């Protein structure tokens, strides 16, 4: 941003006009300049945004506050501004670098030359599962999806014919616990973009004999070879119908209808994004063949336990977290290894500036905090214990309150937050009882057990959040007001800041008068500038009828005879020792 500072030598006028402010929901900007004025000579331009006035940020100022702040600068005016050209530029939109969703459309089959890749003999790769069947349609299309449940035929071939066996197909490993998939595919990432750089190639499969291949896996591979052979080559094989399950023996009933259309409808169900760890049909068949279908229940339980102890913030990758790779997700069916996705998901989705683990901050300092595993979205962390609260505000009429700690055993109240019975020590605030761990700020979620809080609009906020978002600013000291607020002259004031100029006492809610823009209490104003009635010794206020006689000023109703109290307004009167008398008592009364 192109920020610059200007210093205009006083006195006013400064040669510019302002527009905007917090009350107009727009930043303070320069609306017009006077030709040859001080602002114009300092190279200030129309449209420049005012960032600070005399060292005080103008971001939260209203239009009137900014005007008063500029008026208060008599000697010199220092401002920090931002050029209009830099302020008008929109910030670049951050594009999420996630994996785009796959567009399902038919792809014609081509057969280019395939480069051979040598592989070591100790690789435990097996063919990916695919349905049984035969060719039935003259025109077939393929739906390439390397990470889907139905792996393409060219990606599941043996190591002698696959150019990229690791990236194109999901390898299967045979271990002591059975057949499982090595890559943990996330449920939301089952659809990955097709590899358009390498067209699908259907190569007739050759039987692969390894030391770890079981008889069931060989039968599955044999069925896959039968399904991949036909008059016309296709990638995902012919359409399939129902699968009858009888003691792990499967009978496939092929159909000879519109295979291309029905294949597109049925097969897309397997690689559509799912929630949780739902298995596709091919994986369920494979799990029953290898005898690992019962391992899924224990895996789901472990995954749920791992996920229940963590609450990652569901924010996009543009907030600072790197996009998840294919290995970060729920464990694939048939695997006996514990999934690491539940342990890594919180770190992968953690936004910038968030803390890792937040311990219960309602505990006293130097006390061991139990491990909870809750993820805090707040930038402030209480560490191992609650930090010592700020000192009590100096305002006597402060709005900040503190909760009262009640030990356990006296009574069992109901918590105002969760409406549950409290067993153990609790807090009392605003006439209600709270669990210590649930008495938190409504904004930052920090505990308020040992710090002050303020009630605002039915919610409870800590001192810091209330000062930041709700507390008004004093018109004299420019500080936040946490106590009693005085509203006068279209501004807010501390009680100790809105005082009489003459006596220095707080005016509070009493009557005051302005003289040359300065407030005076009623007593000092009339003593310095007002007129006192000679008769009642009360001030003659604006609008009162008065008259002047005997060198003094009187209310029209106070200028009466000192003996009979008859009004002497407009009548002949006499005076003895500066006391007015009527004709009747002028010669009969001696003072």
Swiss-Prot record:
The modification N6-acetyllysine is found at residues 89, 350. CDD domains: LIM1_ENH (cd09453), PDZ_PDLIM-like (cd06753). One of its GO terms (cellular component) is cytosol. Keywords: Acetylation, Cell projection, Cytoplasm, Isopeptide bond, LIM domain, Metal-binding, Phosphoprotein, Repeat, Synapse, Ubl conjugation, Zinc. Residues 2-85 form the PDZ domain. The modification N-acetylserine is found at residue 2. Residues 258-273, 294-304 have a biased composition (Basic and acidic residues). It is found in: Postsynaptic density; Presynapse; Postsynapse; Cytoplasm, Cytosol. The modification Phosphoserine is found at residues 2, 111, 134, 137, 228, 260, 313, 322, 359, 361. Residues 121-166, 186-398 are annotated as: Disordered. PROSITE patterns: LIM_DOMAIN_1, LIM_DOMAIN_2, PDZ. One of its GO terms (molecular function) is metal ion binding. Residues 134-143, 186-195, 205-217, 353-385 have a biased composition (Polar residues). Its main location: other. May play an important role in the heart development by scaffolding PKC to the Z-disk region. May play a role in the regulation of cardiomyocyte expansion. Isoforms lacking the LIM domains may negatively modulate the scaffolding activity of isoform 1. Overexpression promotes the development of heart hypertrophy. Contributes to the regulation of dendritic spine morphogenesis in neurons. May be required to restrain postsynaptic growth of excitatory synapses. Isoform 1, but not isoform 2, expression favors spine thinning and elongation. Interacts with various PKC isoforms through the LIM domains. Interacts with actin and alpha-actinin through the PDZ domain. Interacts (via LIM domains) with SIPA1L1/SPAR; this interaction may occur preferentially with isoform 1. This is PDZ and LIM domain protein 5. It comes from Mus musculus (Mouse).
């Amino acid at each position: 941003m192109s920020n610059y500072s200007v210093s205009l030598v006083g006195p006013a006028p400064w040669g510019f006009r302002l527009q905007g402010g917090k009350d107009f929901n727009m930043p303070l900007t320069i609306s017009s300049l006077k030709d040859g004025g001080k602002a114009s000579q300092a190279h200030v331009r129309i449209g420049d945004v005012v960032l600070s006035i005399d060292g005080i940020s103008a971001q939260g100022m209203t239009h009137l506050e900014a005007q008063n702040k500029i008026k208060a600068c008599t000697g010199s005016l220092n401002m920090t501004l931002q050029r209009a050209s830099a302020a008008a530029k929109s910030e670049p939109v951050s594009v999420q670098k996630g994996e785009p969703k796959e567009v399902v459309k038919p792809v014609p089959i081509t057969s280019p030359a395939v480069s051979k890749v040598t592989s070591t003999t100790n690789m435990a790769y097996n063919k990916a599962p695919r349905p049984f069947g035969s060719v039935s349609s003259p025109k077939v299309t393929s739906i390439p999806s390397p990470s889907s449940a139905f792996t393409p035929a060219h990606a599941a071939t043996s190591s002698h014919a696959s150019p990229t066996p690791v990236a194109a197909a999901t390898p299967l490993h045979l271990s002591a616990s059975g057949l499982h998939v090595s890559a943990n595919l996330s449920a939301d990432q089952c659809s990955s973009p097709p590899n358009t750089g390498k067209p699908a190639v259907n190569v007739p499969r050759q039987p692969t004999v390894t030391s770890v291949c079981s008889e069931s896996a060989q039968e599955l591979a044999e069925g896959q070879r039968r399904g991949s052979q036909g008059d016309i080559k296709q990638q995902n094989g012919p359409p399939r119908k129902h699968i009858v399950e009888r003691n792990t023996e499967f009978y496939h009933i092929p159909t000879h209808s519109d295979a291309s259309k029905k294949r597109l409808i049925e097969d897309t169900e397997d690689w559509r994004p799912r929630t949780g760890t739902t298995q596709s049909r091919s994986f369920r068949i494979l799990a029953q063949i290898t005898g690992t279908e019962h391992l899924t229940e224990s895996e789901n339980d472990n995954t749920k336990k791992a996920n229940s102890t963590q609450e990652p913030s569901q924010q996009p990758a543009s907030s600072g977290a790197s996009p998840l790779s294919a290995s970060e997700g729920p464990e694939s069916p048939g695997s006996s290894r514990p999934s690491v996705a539940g342990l890594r998901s919180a770190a992968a989705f953690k936004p910038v500036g968030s803390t890792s683990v937040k311990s219960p901050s309602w505990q006293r300092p130097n006390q061991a905090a139990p491990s909870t595993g809750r993820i805090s979205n707040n930038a402030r962390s209480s560490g191992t214990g609650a930090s010592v609260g700020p000192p009590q505000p100096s305002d006597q009429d402060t709005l900040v309150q503190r909760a009262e700690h009640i030990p356990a055993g006296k009574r069992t109240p109901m918590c105002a937050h969760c409406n549950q019975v409290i067993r153990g020590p609790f807090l009392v605030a605003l006439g209600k009882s709270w669990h210590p761990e649930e008495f938190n700020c409504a904004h930052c979620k920090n505990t308020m057990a040992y710090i002050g809080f303020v009630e605002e609009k039915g919610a409870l906020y800590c001192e810091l959040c209330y000062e930041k978002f709700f507390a008004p600013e004093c018109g004299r000291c420019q500080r936040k007001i946490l106590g009693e607020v005085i509203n006068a002259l279209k501004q807010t004031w501390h009680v100790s800041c809105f005082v009489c100029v003459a006596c220095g006492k707080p005016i509070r809610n009493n009557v005051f008068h302005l003289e040359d823009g300065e407030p005076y209490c009623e007593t000092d104003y009339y003593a310095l500038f007002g007129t006192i009635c000679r008769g009642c010794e009360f001030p003659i206020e604006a609008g009162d009828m008065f008259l002047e006689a005997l060198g003094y000023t009187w209310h029209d109703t106070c200028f009466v005879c000192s003996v009979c109290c008859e009004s002497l307004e407009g009548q002949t009167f006499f005076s003895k020792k500066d006391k007015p008398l009527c004709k009747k008592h002028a010669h009969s009364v001696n003072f």
